[in-house]
Swiss-Prot record:
It catalyses: (7R,8S)-7,8-diammoniononanoate + CO2 + ATP = (4R,5S)-dethiobiotin + ADP + phosphate + 3 H(+). The active site is at residue 37. NCBIfam families: bioD. Mg(2+) binds at residues 16, 54, 120. Keywords: ATP-binding, Biotin biosynthesis, Cytoplasm, Ligase, Magnesium, Metal-binding, Nucleotide-binding. Its EC number is 6.3.3.3. ATP binds at residues 12-17, 54, 120-123, 186-187. Homodimer. Belongs to the dethiobiotin synthetase family. It comes from Alteromonas mediterranea (strain DSM 17117 / CIP 110805 / LMG 28347 / Deep ecotype). GO terms for cellular component: cytosol. This is ATP-dependent dethiobiotin synthetase BioD. It is found in: Cytoplasm.
Length: 233
């Protein structure tokens, strides 16, 4: 079983979309693949359960060997109501964002023994989990990923500023002693000026492999994601 952490250069860069595309591609390649979003904010009460749209998409894209649909509270064990920064939402709701809770959920999904397990973060790499009395963060989600020694998939949202965001995020991941397995260029606007020039710059500046280039709201060629899955499996 291979486990990866999916992070992004910012919030709203398509982490969930990329995660779901990779899960489906793996399942279509006769592999079992499960997604995990330990923390999600902006949840709504549906049939007695707190549900986040991203977590629901991951649930639908995941597949176990026995074909069962995993419970949403296993895909997303920490569901927060306000659509705000998770550590602020957790503080307001009296919820503890702990390493133990996140690792426990990961281990529960690993027990299904999928070929690939993707854990998706929230926001960017340095997402605060807990803060001290002076509002200074004391723990970050990246600390959990570091402790779990997970390789990282970096989703780059292709928009103005992505070069700086990608380089800084990659530097932070490497500084934490983790391996970037590869990165995904996700076209999130469809109208980025000098898109190809920016993509070429990223290829030149990031030593890690480009796993896939995902176009804006159009079909993805099967071979594109199959190549990514071959590198991940």
């Amino acid at each position: 079983m291979k486990q990866y952490f999916v992070t992004g250069t910012d919030t709203e860069v398509g982490k969930t979309y990329v995660t779901c595309q990779l899960l489906r591609a793996a399942n279509n390649a006769s592999l079992t693949a499960i997604g995990y979003k330990p923390i999600a904010a902006g949840c709504e009460l549906v049939n007695g359960e707190w549900v986040n749209e991203d977590a629901l998409n991951i649930q639908q894209a995941s597949a176990c060997a026995n074909g069962q649909t995993l419970p949403i509270n296993e895909i997303n064990p920490i569901a927060l109501t306000p659509p705000i920064a998770p550590h602020i939402a957790a503080n307001e709701e009296g919820v503890a964002l702990t390493h133990e809770k996140i690792a426990e959920g990961l281990n529960a999904l690993a027990a299904y023994r999928p070929d690939i397990l993707l854990m998706e973060g929230a926001g960017g790499w340095r997402l605060p989990l807990t803060i001290g009395s002076d509002n200074t963060p004391t723990h970050y989600l990246s600390d959990v990923v570091k402790a779990l020694k997970m390789d990282v998939i970096l989703v780059v949202g292709m928009r103005l500023g992505c070069l700086n965001h990608a380089l800084l995020t990659a530097e932070a991941i490497r500084a934490d002693g983790l391996i970037i397995k590869g990165w995904v260029a996700n076209d999130i606007t469809g109208n980025m000026t000098r898109y190809q020039e920016n993509l070429r710059s990223l290829k030149a500046m990031l030593p890690e492999p480009l796993l896939a280039e995902i176009p804006y709201q159009t079909g993805i060629e099967a071979g594109t994601l199959l190549s990514a899955i071959e590198q991940l499996s």
